[in-house]
UniProtKB/Swiss-Prot annotation:
Keyword Magnesium: no
Binding site for ATP: 97-107
Cross-referenced InterPro entries: GHMP_kinase_C_dom, GHMP_kinase_C_sf, GHMP_kinase_N_dom, IspE, Ribosomal_Su5_D2-typ_SF, Ribsml_uS5_D2-typ_fold_subgr
Name of the gene this protein is made from: ispE
Record EC number: 2.7.1.148
Name listed for the protein in its UniProt record: 4-diphosphocytidyl-2-C-methyl-D-erythritol kinase
Described function: Catalyzes the phosphorylation of the position 2 hydroxy group of 4-diphosphocytidyl-2C-methyl-D-erythritol.
Annotated keywords: ATP-binding, Isoprene biosynthesis, Kinase, Nucleotide-binding, Transferase
UniProt entry tagged with the keyword Kinase: yes
Single Gene Ontology MF annotation: ATP binding
Reactions this protein catalyses: 4-CDP-2-C-methyl-D-erythritol + ATP = 4-CDP-2-C-methyl-D-erythritol 2-phosphate + ADP + H(+)
């Protein structure tokens, strides 16, 4: 019988942003092969773990209504995969829209795993077997464990960190539509696309990086836009802002990101677009590694 977590733990679960997403094939088991440059935002959900005799789950916050309850919740599914995990009462403050292409549910599952491992040091978050089991819950979960800028290959399990990646100032927009990842994959016309070229060297500045990103793709965007035309409206709104350097969809959508030269420009764009589209979820952010912020805090 496992004991409750010995302390209160709070974990930040940052949004995951696919700066690029090349779909390069499909395995016989149906999983798609990816080649993606991923960064993490300084906006996200917050998961709190408190001692309990049985697993408990409560969701609060502005996006709580759309989160599934009970056994279908990814937080509880991830916790159940950790052998002998201490019991906890989870409180998830849900700030990210669900089914939005920015890894919200996967980030929450990874946060639960990190929190439980921090509360019981004999559990290793880098255990390969456990990470493999987490992958069965979602291809984004392993990358969300580390929260570092990385090149992601395979089906999501091959993670190559990108050192000294420059901070990118961005605006995230979701048009308040949920998109099914399996539906987008099903709608794709081409699954065997070219992989990414080499990522620019560490000495690359932001201007050169944006130029390189402009030459890359999100191979899921066309299919996602066919299913949800609002994605095209979001991208056009971002591209129409005078300061936007690049706009693209993240993941399977419907969230898009726009890159801006400075934090001030991103904040101004967020204000302008929020005024023009008050029904959308819009956040200014900085993209890069969030590994330090994602470290669980014990109290």
């Amino acid at each position: 019988m496992s004991m409750p977590v010995p302390q209160v733990v709070e974990v930040f679960a940052p949004a995951k942003i696919n700066l690029t997403l090349h779909v390069t094939g499909q395995r016989p088991d149906g999983y798609h092969l990816l080649d993606s440059l991923v960064a993490f935002a300084d906006v996200g959900d917050v998961l709190r773990l408190e001692p309990a005799d049985v697993w408990q789950m409560k969701t609060v916050g502005p996006e709580a209504e759309a989160v599934p309850d009970g056994a279908e919740n990814l937080v509880l599914k991830a916790a159940a995969l950790l052998d002998g995990a201490p019991k906890a009462a989870f409180t998830l403050t849900k700030n990210l829209p669900v089914a939005s292409g920015i890894g919200g549910g996967s980030a929450d599952a990874a946060a639960a795993f990190r929190g439980l491992c921090a509360a019981t040091p004999h559990h290793d978050p880098n255990n390969i077997d456990t990470q493999r089991r987490l992958l069965s819950l979602g291809a984004d979960i392993p990358m969300c464990l580390h929260c570092v800028t990385a090149r992601i290959t395979g089906i999501g399990e091959e993670i190559t960190p990108v050192a000294q990646f420059p901070a990118l100032h961005a605006v995230l927009i979701n048009p308040r539509v949920a998109v099914s990842t399996p539906a987008v994959f099903k709608a794709m016309k081409q699954r065997n696309n070219p992989p990414m070229p080499d990522i620019p060297p560490e000495s690359c500045d932001v201007k050169d990086l944006v130029e390189w990103l402009r030459a890359q793709r999100n191979d899921m965007q066309e299919a996602a836009t066919t299913l949800e035309p609002a994605i095209a409206t979001v991208q056009a709104a971002l591209e129409g802002h005078r300061a936007c350097q690049l706009a693209r969809m993240s993941g399977s959508g419907a969230t898009c990101f726009g890159l801006f030269h400075t934090a001030q420009a991103a904040q101004q764009a967020a204000r302008d677009l929020s005024r023009d589209y008050p029904q959308w979820w819009i956040r200014p952010t900085q993209l890069g590694s969030q590994a330090e912020r994602a470290v669980p805090r014990l109290s």
